[in-house]
Amino acid sequence: MRKSEVDVLIIGAGPSGSVAAAYLHQQGCKVKVVEKNSFPRFVIGESLLPRCMEHFEEVGLLKALNDFGFEEKHGARFMKEGVVCHFDFSKKHTDGWNWTWQVPRADFDKVLTDTLQEKGVDISFQQEVIAVEFDEDGCSRTQIKGVDGVIQEISAKFVIDSSGFGRVLPRLLGLEKPSSLAVHSSMFTHVVDKNRPQGNEGTLITFDVVRDDSWIWVIPFSNGITSLGFVGPTEYLESLEGSVEARWQQLLGHSDYYYDRF
């Protein structure tokens, strides 16, 4: 088994893992990032908050992201039964950024990892964490399995779990606990937004609360694609019948505001 040593092992190459890697690399740490998937890859989580921007700037990732031309996000809109609430990020009580981005994550995450690699950060894709052990002094030994089946061991002083929904360390260390929240699921897609209005209406991220326990998200991107999703009780989504298109028509039927557009 091939073995190596680093200061910090980071699990997951998404935004949190990338920012952590960039910062630690700046501080002179020997960093290794392992990512289960290959990039680019589709994933949701496509709307940022302005608080993120200073972190991208601090670790030297902001310019590459800004140069890509992602859709700017200056606020958000929430709707329910004709009542509309706008949040304007410029109306704030503290210093800091008043805008951010709406991003297709396949592009966004690829820009982050490409920039990291240009800076000299070691990133390995299609590498799955299968086991981890911690010594009494807190140092770790983590086994990584590649798509070729080859297993390697990485020793690290620290491990950062940036795997998000993958929950790598909680699963491997038996730390998972059931959620007390109601069980929800989502159905989502990317669509060519042929009927997108001009101006702010066409680019404004919106959450249309169509029932007390369900909502539709609309996240326009700068490339003419819009992320469209429905979140609701799992039981309700599983009760829908017909083709994917037919189920989408049923879900969009809850929104008087967006049905005709999509």
PLM segments and residue spans:
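Short phosphate-binding/catalytic loops that engage adenosine nucleotides
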Residues: 29, 61, 121
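Helix-loop-beta segment of a Rossmann-like dinucleotide-binding subdomain
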Residues: 84-103, 141, 231-235
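Predominantly flavin-linked oxidoreductase catalytic cores and closely associated redox partners
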Residues: 115-258
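N-terminal FAD cofactor-binding segment of flavoenzymes
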Residues: 42-81
